Structure formats: structure tokens, C-alpha cells
């Protein structure tokens, strides 16, 4: 974790924008302003927000403004309650390890899916790069298969450029 102010004690908001049923009711009501207030009252300094790519992208790879609006709202709440944010892309097109619906695979072998990943991160950076003091980014959750180390290091390096 960063050795900057505000990234020492946090909580994960899993099950809201990731690894969920994606219903509008859940997306709109699973996490509320009172949750952010409670987290701050516990003395925590940041929240980790896992997000699945399909919150931010349509099937064709175009962006969903409604997904970015959810993150915008979460960042407003974090600012209001003095919390920093870890924004975690929990899965991407072609990479998933959860049991919610799709069986995603092929990311590490597909230039097309990797380009889509880069475009998504460019859009995330465009939206949230100005929050550099209060937000950190996890490019992709739990890339643990050792056979993908070289591919992942290449992809991560390209994405960060």
C-alpha cells in the first residue's frame, strides 16, 4: 500500500460494483451515503472499490456513463467524509475468476482484449486522474497464474505508459 497520508486503514466495498447480480436495485442501494459516514466514523482512511468492467463498458466496448456516474458519486462521498479511494478493476473482458455469469478467458492471449483494456484505463484516467492525491488504481485484481507473469508485466507496463 502507498506510504502516503490516508492509505493505512481501509475497508473493501466488495459486492457492490463487482461480483454481484448487476441489478439496478443492487447497484443503487447496496452502498449508501450512510455507509461512507459509518466507515469514516470508524477511523478508517480509505475505501477500496472493486469494479467489474461491465459496470463501465457495454458488450461492444463502448463506455457506460451510468457506471462512471456511480464512481463519481462514490468519490463525492469519499471526499465528503474524508476518505481516500483505491479503485480496483476487478475483472476485464477476457479475465474473470468469479462465478457471476460469464466464463471470461483469453485476455492474456488476445491483442484485441488487451487493447480494450488499455482503452478502458485511458477512460478511467481521463475521468479520475485529477484526483491523484486521494485515489490509487489497481489495474487488475489478483493476476495469480504464474504462466501469465510475462504477459501481465508487459500489459501492465504498456497500460501505465
Where are these regions (language model features)?
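Active-site mouth of glycoside hydrolases
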Residues: 2-161
Amino acid at each position: 500500500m502507498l506510504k502516503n497520508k490516508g492509505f493505512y486503514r481501509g475497508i473493501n466495498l466488495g459486492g457492490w460494483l463487482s461480483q454481484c447480480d448487476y441489478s439496478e436495485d443492487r447497484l443503487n442501494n447496496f452502498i449508501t451515503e450512510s455507509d461512507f459516514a459509518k466507515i469514516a466514523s470508524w477511523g478508517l482512511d480509505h475505501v477500496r472499490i472493486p469494479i467489474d468492467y461491465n459496470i463501465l463498458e457495454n458488450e461492444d466496448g463502448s463506455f457506460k456513463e451510468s457506471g462512471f456516474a456511480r464512481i463519481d458519486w462514490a468519490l463525492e462521498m469519499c471526499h465528503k467524509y474524508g476518505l481516500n479511494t483505491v479503485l480496483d478493476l476487478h475483472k476485464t473482458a477476457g479475465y474473470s475468476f468469479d462465478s457471476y455469469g460469464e466464463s471470461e478467458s483469453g485476455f492474456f492471449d488476445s491483442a484485441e482484449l488487451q487493447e480494450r483494456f488499455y482503452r478502458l484505463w485511458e477512460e478511467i484516467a481521463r475521468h479520475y486522474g485529477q484526483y491523484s492525491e486521494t485515489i490509487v488504481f489497481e489495474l487488475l485484481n489478483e493476476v495469480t497464474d504464474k504462466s501469465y507473469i510475462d504477459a501481465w508485466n508487459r500489459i501492465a507496463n504498456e497500460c501505465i505508459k
